[in-house]
């Protein structure tokens, strides 16, 4: 096992805040002396079926703890998922059914093991203990926190001040998340910066239970491909970990050098010395790694993580062919459209699978990122005449061959 100082250097990497750092050092010191690993926890509510790399910031930090020899608890919030996390929301979130939550949870398990070692990961569901609670137990838990304390949360405070409704069950969410730490006797809990309040509730509940309070480590919310907004499927600025290898590679290659450095810090396994070479290259210092080569290395690393090394090399070869030689890929999907009335360009993009929604399609057109037959489309209201065959392109990497079928 590495020394406390060596472990802290790895743990600090990319972290926004460690509460309380001296307590974590003491926990690590005891772990080194006794050989007993720390219990490290991170919770994920299965509110959607697929993860993107923004979610993997926490999973990657869990992997670092795992590689340091600690016990990793990947907590699936199947109980909290049915409440709906109110964090950052300006309105009450729609709760999912148990069937939806369990279906999403199954895909989460498959996807996280692209990063975590399944043999050394404990997957736990918080319904295991919350589902056993009686109404009296739940009311007792609710009695441990006041409404005034809950309103210290920025999102609740804004909604209350703006006379927007807050449902009673939303106050239960941070208490249930906090109680998860009591049930697991967690030594460390990881979460995004937006989860800080909930993580500290866990510390407080552990103190009330007579447990040694967990240390809290917050990680930043990863910016999406635009480098501005939080990575989100609804904004179309995401890299999905189940996307085709060539898509993952191409999207990484599209980001700015500054954003690449951020992705290295939060997503990569490279050691601190190599990370410094990447940083020096981005800052233009002598001896630094060339940003283009660094970007390729990062793209290969992520593709290999989600697929394998062979897929990473194939994706790189295709990228070089497609973008260095400005070629349209050979294996683009073919989409058959019945010839008839003209088709709205945004609907065409969505039907072709190039965008997730008409809203995303409209944004891409406005950004000048859509081409039809090699010509840039500037009008989001364009009606495409159904004739022959056309190459439709969204962004730098997404193509479809549109074939209009003649009506008989």
From Swiss-Prot:
E.C. code: 6.1.1.1
Name of a matching Pfam family: tRNA-synt_1b
Reaction it catalyzes: tRNA(Tyr) + L-tyrosine + ATP = L-tyrosyl-tRNA(Tyr) + AMP + diphosphate + H(+)
Motif 'KMSKS' region mapped to chain: 230-234
Coiled-coil regions listed: none
Family, similarity comment: Belongs to the class-I aminoacyl-tRNA synthetase family. TyrS type 2 subfamily.
Stated name of the protein: Tyrosine--tRNA ligase
Species of origin: Syntrophotalea carbinolica (strain DSM 2380 / NBRC 103641 / GraBd1) (Pelobacter carbinolicus)
Record lineage: Bacteria, Pseudomonadati, Thermodesulfobacteriota, Desulfuromonadia, Desulfuromonadales
Name of the gene encoding the protein in the UniProt record: tyrS
């Amino acid at each position: 096992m590495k020394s406390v100082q060596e472990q802290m250097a790895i743990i600090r990497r990319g972290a926004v805040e460690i509460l309380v750092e001296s307590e974590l050092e003491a926990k690590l010191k005891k772990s080194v002396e006794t050989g007993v690993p720390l219990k490290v926890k991170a919770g994920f509510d299965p509110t959607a079926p697929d993860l993107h790399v923004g979610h993997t910031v926490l999973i990657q930090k869990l992997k670092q703890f795992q590689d340091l020899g600690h016990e990793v608890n990947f907590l699936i919030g199947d109980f909290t998922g049915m409440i709906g996390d109110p964090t950052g929301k300006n309105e009450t979130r729609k709760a999912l059914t148990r069937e939806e939550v369990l279906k999403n949870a199954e895909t989460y398990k498959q996807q996280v093991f692209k990063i975590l070692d399944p043999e050394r990961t404990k997957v736990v569901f918080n319904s295991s203990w919350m589902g056993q609670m009686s109404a009296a137990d739940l009311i007792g838990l609710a009695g441990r926190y006041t409404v005034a304390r809950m309103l210290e949360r920025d999102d609740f405070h804004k909604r209350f001040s703006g006379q927007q409704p807050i449902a009673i069950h939303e106050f239960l969410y941070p208490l249930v998340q906090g109680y998860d730490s009591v049930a697991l006797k967690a030594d460390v809990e990881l979460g995004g910066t937006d989860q800080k309040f909930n993580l500290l509730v866990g510390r407080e509940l552990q103190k009330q239970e007579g447990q040694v309070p967990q240390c809290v480590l917050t990680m930043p919310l990863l910016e999406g491909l635009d480098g501005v907004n939080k990575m989100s499927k609804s904004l179309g600025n995401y890299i999905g970990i189940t996307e085709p290898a060539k898509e993952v590679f191409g999207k990484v290659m599209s980001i700015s050098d500054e954003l690449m450095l951020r992705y290295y810090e939060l997503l990569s396994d490279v050691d601190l010395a190599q990370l410094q070479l990447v940083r020096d290259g981005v800052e233009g210092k002598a001896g630094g790694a060339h940003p283009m080569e660094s970007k390729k290395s990062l793209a290969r690393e992520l593709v290999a993580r989600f697929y394998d090394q062979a897929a990473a090399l194939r994706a790189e070869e295709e990228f070089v062919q497609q973008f260095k030689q400005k070629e349209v890929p050979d294996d683009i999907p073919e989409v058959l459209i019945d010839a008839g009335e003209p088709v709205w360009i945004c609907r065409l993009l969505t039907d072709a699978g190039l965008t997730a929604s008409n809203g995303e399609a409209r944004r891409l057109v406005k950004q000048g990122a859509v081409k039809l037959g090699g010509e840039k489309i500037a009008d989001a209201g364009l009606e495409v005449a159904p004739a022959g065959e056309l190459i439709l392109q969204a962004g730098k990497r997404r193509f479809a061959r549109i074939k209009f079928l003649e009506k008989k």
